[in-house]
């Protein structure tokens, strides 16, 4: 009972409160009725009533407006939420998102840690096929992620897929995976990927390549590994030493197959692939940037008949990377050492640069002429090469000068610029060299220097499906302007505390020089930027203090000797002999050549004396020139008198007493 009484009292209190709240409304209604009666008796009260109504209308209108605003703002919030949800939906629906594939949690976490949230097209296109056990030929442009296209599905298959039950376990186990690559540098990088991703799944790998200790490699194989990555030569050696057993092999991969052909590994690769007794029990994957006939032959011989092919290049004429800007600049060998630093300044954008030269001698001499660069070629000891490559990857120096040995072994996202000292004779080599930049979604620049008289630039354009931008060498005055801007920024950064120490010298210079403050400051900036003079640079050969002239004879010109004959009629022989880079125009109506800046007036005056037999003018825009393919060179050679850099005490990049000639001396080397 007490509880009932208590609740009744509470209810009573609630009722009283409710009545108290309702009463003002009733009272106000009652008051309004009384007010109406009173207002009918008085005009004054009537006017008051009208005013009151107006106020009520304004108040109601204001309230309605607030409601509309409130509704519209809430609608905006709803719509903005819808927009955000829409964006999120788009991100989730990315068909190449890692979450869309059968990738286990440890691998997903590792990919996320490396900033990979979606697979590249070649990876996405091949993942399910490889994981489901199909033999595959994969083709994509250089730098498009072919390595992870086989690393990820192979690892998943070994741990969670079809290969798990067949994998041998324990000490001394035979490998389940064999990966062949053309260079030790590339082999080490692929092995590093298997270590990084496979390590998270408890799988072990080893890398076998020449130059590394046999006993160390043999020890790893004896203890047992799941994955073997290596170069054909060293893999073949271990097979002959009976260190490799392919009885439990489930995957064999040929990466950069086209490059193995180019580097002469055909017999080794075929021998290694033939060591698998029952190829029907092994899944074979072949990845390549191009598909020459040997690669197609290998796929027909060693892959199953129901093999799959994923070709992301197809009939597209563009075989080289489409994220790379391709530039061709005419250059005389003697101008190269001075030109290359300016090219780096113009096109590297603060990133790293790789310079490719054709021989070890070129690499050594050029790296010695470029500040802060390092050399990489086949005669450098392996241990030093590894230190050099590690330093380049870690950004300890910005410029690497290399032979083709490094072309396929570097996968560094920050390489912004590739410079090739001359067009390679093989188009595939150009594709792979230029592919060292513009990787992993980045953009890059590939500059090719060429001799305008003998060049394979047009052939590369045709076969690689690219279009070169034919540009003149960066002119020193352009470089100076850029350097002046950088110097000005450095001046602004000078701490105010050091200014008083230089004020006296500045005042004295201003008073005694007879120059304006503006001119003095410009000279100071020039000195800071490293310029004490600006030399003109030829459009034809890029040589400093030379100017390019265009000769026309009013009739077709079929040979350089005709041009020399015209010039000798009006000019001294010694001056004619000193012209550089004589080339005929593509339309056969003229020729271009370089003369020293100091001889320009002499040549122009000579043309005026020719009685109209020829005309000469300074070239502003280079006309299209006839090209001559360079003569084929033997793979081996060397020795002899002088060298290709200029012979006779000088070098190729800075002149010298005479032209070097290869002899019939010692045997050359591959790199």
UniProtKB/Swiss-Prot annotation:
It catalyses: ATP + H2O = ADP + phosphate + H(+). It is found in: Nucleus. The modification Phosphoserine is found at residues 40, 42. Residues 1-84, 627-671 are annotated as: Disordered. GO terms for molecular function: ATP binding; ATP hydrolysis activity; DEAD/H-box RNA helicase binding; RNA binding; RNA helicase activity. Pfam families: DEAD, GUCT, Helicase_C. GO terms for cellular component: nucleolus; nucleus. ATP binds at residues 140-147. Residues 339-479 form the Helicase C-terminal domain. GO terms for biological process: RNA metabolic process. The keyword Nucleus applies. The keyword tRNA-binding does not apply. Residues 26-41 have a biased composition (Basic and acidic residues). Residues 636-671 have a biased composition (Gly residues). A motif (Q motif) lies at residues 96-124. Its main location: nucleus. Its EC number is 3.6.4.13. Belongs to the DEAD box helicase family. DDX21/DDX50 subfamily. This is DEAD-box ATP-dependent RNA helicase 7. It comes from Arabidopsis thaliana (Mouse-ear cress).
């Amino acid at each position: 009972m007490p509880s009932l009484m208590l609740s009744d009292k509470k209810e009573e209190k609630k009722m009283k409160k409710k009545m108290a709240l309702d009463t003002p409304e009733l009272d106000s209604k009652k008051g309004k009725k009384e007010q109406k009666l009173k207002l009918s008796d008085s005009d004054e009260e009537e006017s008051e009533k009208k005013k009151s109504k107006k106020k009520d209308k304004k108040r109601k209108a204001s309230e309605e407006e607030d409601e509309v605003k409130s509704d519209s703002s809430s609608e905006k919030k709803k719509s903005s939420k819808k927009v955000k949800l829409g964006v999120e939906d788009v991100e989730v629906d990315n068909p190449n998102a890692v979450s869309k594939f059968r990738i286990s949690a440890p691998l997903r976490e590792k990919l996320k840690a490396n900033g990979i949230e979606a697979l590249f097209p070649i990876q996405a296109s091949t993942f399910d096929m490889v994981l489901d056990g199909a033999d595959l030929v994969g083709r994509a442009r250089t730098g498009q992620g072919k390595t992870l296209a086989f690393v990820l599905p192979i690892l998943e298959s070994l741990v969670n897929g079809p290969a798990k039950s067949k994998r041998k376990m324990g000490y001394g186990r035979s490998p389940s995976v064999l990966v062949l690559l053309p260079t030790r540098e590339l082999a080490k990088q692929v092995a590093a990927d298997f270590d990084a991703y496979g390590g998270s799944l408890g799988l072990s790998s080893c890398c076998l390549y020449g130059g590394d200790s046999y006993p160390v490699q043999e020890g790893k194989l004896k203890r047992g590994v799941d994955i073997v990555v290596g170069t054909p030569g060293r893999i073949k050696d271990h097979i002959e030493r009976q260190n490799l057993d392919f009885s439990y092999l489930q995957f064999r991969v040929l990466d950069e197959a086209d490059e193995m052909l180019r580097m002469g590994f055909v017999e080794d690769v075929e021998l290694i692939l033939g060591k698998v007794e029952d190829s029907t029990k092994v899944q074979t994957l072949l990845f390549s940037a191009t598909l020459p006939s040997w690669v197609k032959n290998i796929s027909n011989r060693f892959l199953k008949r129901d093999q799959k092919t994923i070709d992301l290049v197809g009939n597209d004429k563009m075989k080289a990377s489409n994220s790379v800007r391709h530039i061709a600049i005419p250059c005389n060998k003697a101008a190269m050492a001075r030109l290359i630093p300016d090219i780096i300044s113009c096109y590297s954008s603060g990133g790293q640069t790789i310079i490719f030269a054709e021989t070890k001698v070129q690499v050594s001499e050029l790296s010695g002429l470029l500040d802060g660069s390092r050399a990489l070629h086949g005669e450098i000891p392996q241990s030093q090469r590894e230190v050099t490559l590690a330093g380049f990857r870690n950004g300890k120096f910005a410029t690497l000068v290399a032979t083709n040995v490094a072309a396929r072994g570097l996968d560094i996202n920050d390489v912004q610029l590739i410079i090739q000292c001359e067009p390679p004779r093989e188009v595939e080599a150009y594709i792979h060299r230029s592919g060292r930049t513009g990787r992993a979604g980045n953009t890059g620049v590939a500059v090719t220097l060429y001799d305008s008289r003998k060049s394979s630039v047009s052939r590369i354009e045709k076969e690689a499906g690219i279009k070169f931008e034919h540009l003149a060498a960066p002119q020193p005055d352009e470089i100076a302007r850029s350097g002046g801007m950088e110097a000005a920024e450095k001046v602004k950064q000078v701490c105010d505390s050091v200014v008083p120490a230089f004020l006296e010298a500045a005042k004295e210079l201003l008073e005694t020089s007879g120059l304006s403050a503006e001119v003095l400051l410009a000279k100071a900036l020039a000195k800071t930027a490293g310029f004490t003079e600006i030399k003109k640079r030829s459009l034809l050969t890029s040589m400093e203090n030379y100017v390019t002239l265009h000769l026309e004879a009013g009739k077709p010109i079929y040979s350089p000797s005709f041009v020399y004959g015209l010039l000798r009629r009006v000019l001294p022989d010694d001056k004619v002999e000193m012209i550089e880079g004589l080339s005929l125009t593509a339309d056969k109506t003229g020729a271009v050549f370089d003369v020293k800046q100091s001889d320009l007036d002499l040549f122009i005056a000579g043309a005026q004396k020719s009685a109209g037999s020829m005309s000469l003018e300074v070239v502003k825009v280079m006309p299209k020139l006839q090209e001559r393919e360079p003569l084929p060179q033997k793979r081996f050679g060397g020795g002899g008198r002088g060298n290709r850099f200029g012979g006779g005490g000088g070098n190729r990049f800075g002149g010298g007493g005479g032209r070097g000639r290869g002899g019939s001396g010692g045997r050359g080397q591959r790199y």
